[in-house]
Every structure is written in C-alpha cells, then in structure tokens.
Curated annotation (Swiss-Prot):
Disruption phenotype: Abolishes completely the production of KK-1. It comes from the Eukaryota. HAMAP family: P5C_reductase. Keywords: Antibiotic biosynthesis, Glycoprotein, NADP, Oxidoreductase, Signal. The lineage of its organism: Eukaryota, Fungi, Dikarya, Ascomycota, Pezizomycotina. Pathway: Secondary metabolite biosynthesis. This is Delta-1-pyrroline-5-carboxylate reductase kk1I. Its EC number is 1.5.1.-. It comes from Curvularia clavata.
C-alpha cells in the first residue's frame, strides 16, 4: 500500500470491509459491526489535523446488496463531519475491491466463499491487505478459499460493537508467515482509531472472540438486571440506566488501573456491610459460574462457525 494524497477504505458487501486506496472506504454493513468500524474511523478523523501524516484514509465506499441497507448506513453515519467522504455502492462489490488498497472482510460467515467466487474478485484481491473479522474462520481457511494464499495478505482481527464510541477491545492475530510491516501498521492504525488493540496467538483467537466480541452483550444483560432492580424499588428507568452504566465504566477503569478485579471487590465490600450481603446473594445465584460458562459456550460456538464451513 503506497501513501497518496487521497486513499480509500472499502467495506464490501455483507460487512466486507476493504481498504481501497489508503483513505477511501467501500463499506458493506455487517450487521452492526461493519457500520461500527466505519463510524468509529470517521469519528477519529475529526480529531486529526489536515496535515496529519499518520492518517490513512480520506475517503470511504460502502458496498451493499440492498438500497435499504445503503440508506441505513447513510443514516447511521450522517452525523459525522466526514460523512460526505463515504460513497455507497449497491451490488458493486468488484468495483469496490478494485478501488481498494486493502479489505476488511466482515460478511456473514457463510457468505465469504460466494463473495470470493464473484467473477474477477480473486484477481482484484491479489496483493491487497485483507482484514477478516469473521468469527470462527481461520486464516488458513480464507487462504484456501482464495486459492493461492501466497498471493494474498490475510490477517484476522476481532473488534466489538464499542467501535461506535471508539472504545473497542480489538484482538489481532499475529501473522504466522512473513507479513509486510506496512500492512501490519495499517491494520494496527485502523483498529487503534476505534479503541484498544491486543495481539494474540492463533490458539487463543476463539477465546478472545468470546471475551472481546461477545461479552459486551453479557455486560449489557448485567446492567439491565441492575436497572430492573433499581426500577422495582422506585428509581426512574433513565436514571437507573445512566447510573448503572457509569458505575460499570468506573469499575472497569479501576480494574485497568489496579490490574486485579478482586482489589475493587475488597475495597468496596466492608465487613458486615450491605455490599457483602449483595455479593453473597450473587454467589447464591451462581452468577460467577454462569458468567464463566456463558463465555466458554460462546468461544465453543465461535469455533464451530469455522468447522461448519469445512463440513
């Protein structure tokens, strides 16, 4: 990928994201995730100066399969100052890829082979960065579907829905073969624009898919449960949501600072106090084992997604 005055990031069909030139985006909505990544990158651009040498993208292209999807993407990003930098293409995946320097693949897991099979697609993808955010699909599977893996630069990453607010915990799989440093830098820059980045070995990828990708839903259930309890005792729903969410955010900040969640637990739960009684109620409900099991089930299911592709 060469640096130019104008570069394009492309997000292609079903959430398949391609870095088209370095600063333009061709985007297809992958449920919420593809839009979240695009939205986060657009927001990050507002923080950068016009002469910022670290900025990779200036334009974006969203490739969608339905007009209504394109309208939804347009509506979602309309509040961003750089929304006019996004071009939306309907049923023009190949055009989006040809314009791209790199690709963020964010389609539904079972659709990626069909995308690769589109006439001219494999040739258009050659020698370009392909960032896959497909749960359960390994780099080897993607390279096999493309044909000759040596002709493509595929890297796996798993961000989460917090890309929308630029606070994602994104895991990136360390490449197992020689990979151009420039392309690693692009991958790193894309996801640092929308949050924090962690590099992991392939063996830990499915675990981290659950921990980083699925757990926002688990944490939302926990917040919702606290809200229900507060509302049942008379607090307004809005106040309960705001307080619970801010409290969880503050607790997370304390854990990051201390490096140990038990530190927070012991600081808050004084002997004989109300917090300790509440903690005992959680233990009686097997909350710890239930949460741990939910994470393990999600990790196993993430692994199965890739296995089904090979069945």
């Amino acid at each position: 990928m060469t640096k130019r005055e104008s570069n394009t990031l492309a997000v292609l069909g079903c959430g398949m994201v391609f870095l088209v030139s370095l600063l333009d985006l061709a985007n297809r909505l992958l449920g919420a995730l593809g839009t979240a990544i695009l939205s986060g990158i657009l927001a990050s651009m507002a923080d950068q100066t016009a002469d910022d040498s670290g900025r990779l993208f200036t334009n974006f292209t969203a490739c969608v399969r339905r007009k209504e999807t394109g309208a939804a993407v347009s509506d979602k990003i309309s509040s961003h100052a750089n929304a006019n930098k996004v071009e939306i293409l309907n049923k023009e995946n190949l055009r989006g890829v040809k314009q791209a320097d790199a690709v963020l693949l964010a389609c539904q897991t079972h659709l990626y082979k069909a995308l690769f099979d589109e006439p001219g697609m494999r040739e258009a993808l050659k020698k370009k960065l392909i960032i896959s955010v497909l749960a359960g699909v390994t780099t080897a599977q993607l390279e096999a579907a493309l044909g000759n893996g040596e002709d493509y630069f595929v890297i796996r990453a798993m961000p989460n829905i917090a890309c929308f607010v630029r606070d994602s915990a994104t895991v990136i799989e360390k490449p197992q073969r020689t990979f151009p440093e420039a392309l690693l830098h692009v991958t790193d820059t894309v996801f640092k624009a929308v949050g924090n980045v962690f590099y992991i070995q392939p063996s830990a990828y499915d675990i981290c898919t659950a921990l980083c990708g699925s757990s926002p839903a688990f944490l939302a259930v926990f917040i919702d449960s606290m809200v229900d309890g507060a509302v049942a005792m008379g607090l307004s729903h809005k106040d309960a949501v705001d307080m619970a969410a801010c409290t969880m955010r503050g607790a997370a900040s304390l854990v990051l600072e201390s490096g140990n969640p038990w530190t927070i637990r012991h600081q808050v739960a004084s002997p004989g106090g109300s917090t300790m009684q509440g903690l005992l109620a959680l233990e009686q409900g097997n909350v710890r084992s239930t949460i741990s099991n939910a994470l393990m089930v999600a990790a196993k299911e993430a692994k199965k997604l890739g296995s089904k592709e090979n069945a």
